[in-house]
Amino acid sequence: MTGFESVVLDVDGTLVRGGDPVPGAIGALDRLRETGADVLLFSNNPTREPASYREWLADLGFEVRPGEVLTSGVVTAEYLADEHPDDPVYVVGEQGLCDLLAARDRALTDDPEAAAVVVGSIDREFTYDRLRDGLWALDGATFVATDPDRTIPVDGRPLPGSGAIVAALAGAADRDPEAVLGKPSERAATAALDRVRADAGSCLVVGDRLDTDLAMGERAGMTTALVLSGVATREDAAAADPAPDYVLESIADLPAALADR
């Protein structure tokens, strides 16, 4: 049906919306599997372990196999292992991200003065004091961000995401991050393709954000499909340059669209 060896799917806004499956998403994912295509679920949510994501999606009714979930938190951990293997890392973010990094043997510090790397990320308990400490930690340290998502859609309304926290740190320090990880970065695309063991030309990426999901796919040479069940609107799609290869009301329409390919 697909003509693709692999499919990379966003989660929030694509498969799930407001904590519930997008109507038709479970069946669409099952039909993709029937084609034999490798499936990867890639979320820019850095706060959850892939295993936790898998359990949550399974509870919602999705079939998710081991190794089929990638997050911006994991991409960040791999970046730190490659580029800063022994450097103390100060996190401006949530405990879930700290736990994920610690589980991968990253050297975390609570002391802003000891930081060699500062990781900015979503923080739903962000305060002035945390901003102050993050600013102090950035003095002489490398600045990285887990992902650029300024907002996340919840129950039809936007909530501040990692990008908002990173922007606060960047504004206070008057500097941009040296690396922004997660989608749409080149490192994120490489991490995804490594996991599905496919080249970009045989991979389809599906998501609800033009600036992350589809930008990653377009830059890497993947085929792109925009779903309108999350952030992007049809007007956004019409104005996009380059235009998505597919524009769908939701992932439920994907099997039929690919059948005509």
Where are these regions (language model features)?
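Asp-based, Mg2+/Mn2+-dependent phosphohydrolase catalytic module
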Residues: 1-9, 16-20, 26-27, 31-37, ...
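Conserved phosphate-coupling serine/threonine residues in phosphotransfer and NTP-handling enzymes
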Residues: 43
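Hydrophobic alpha-helical segments within soluble ligand-binding/sensing domains
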Residues: 73-77
